[in-house]
């Protein structure tokens, strides 16, 4: 049996960490599993490198959402299956909607009978559930809700952050609000729920529903035009033996958060990944200007040079985002006396707004 699942979910919902935990768990306990990282920037995504450093069989599809590259996705899946992989999971960009139609129906129509599609899976973190339950409203609520409307399977992630009663309460609410989907809770950190997720993907199939989500309509376009993407890859030469890579990542994330907040913008997800030639690496995440910076993985030893990948998605005009993040990288790198060599940089708006 060969299964393929799309993991949708808003920025910071835990798609990458869940895919890493799931593929490692499934490979250990059941059969070979692999993951695909997908985003709009060029090659060298932070998520893909992080997955590989974490020991996963991982690859990436870049420059386009997998919604629009069915042929490339199909070729990748066929290659994995030929190598004996029974489960492949891929995310989509964190602001993406419409993958149920474009990916699942696209594959089934272009390659009838060739791919066994697992339940269309949407991850949601507790913070997002709390926001939706509060009915406070927000500029990106259309995306948050629409992703869940598409789901066959809703995965409440990061359940280690909640009491068991709160987990049950959130699951009840999700099932009531989105009755066409099953809902389960998992923790990529502790491993809770990974067996249930593995079994759900392998033993169930996609419903192939086509809910009306207003794709391409005015609300969709208004939401998308607020979003911008930033991708940066660089090499940093370290001058001093006492360089602290973890402090550098924290300070850089803090500086970007401060700059974004001062500009009256929001950054739902910033990913900072750095690694040394010796194989040691560190990763920092920022999931919004009002939230603490998370050190997902820490350097364990000093290093003399770093490769750094920065990926960010923000509700901010792209030209402004470019200036804010680029200036922060220069300021903090100068403070740490790092000599930078920029390999690539991209910054663009989903609506090309100024």
Segments (PLM) and residue ranges:
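Short, aromatic/basic amphipathic alpha-helical patches
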Residues: 47-54, 168-175, 324-329
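Nucleotide-state-sensitive switch-loop elements of NTP-binding domains
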Residues: 2-8, 13, 17-142
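Canonical P-loop GTPase G-domain recognition
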Residues: 141, 145-155, 159-222
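Conserved, well-folded catalytic cores of nucleic-acid-processing
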Residues: 25, 43, 79-83, 106, ...
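A structural preference for short, hydrophobic beta-strand core positions in alpha/beta folds
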Residues: 35, 183-185, 342
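A short acidic, often aromatic-flanked loop/helix-cap motif at beta-alpha or helix-coil junctions
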Residues: 65-68, 190-194, 279, 348-351
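P-loop NTP-binding site
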Residues: 1-8, 12-17, 203-354
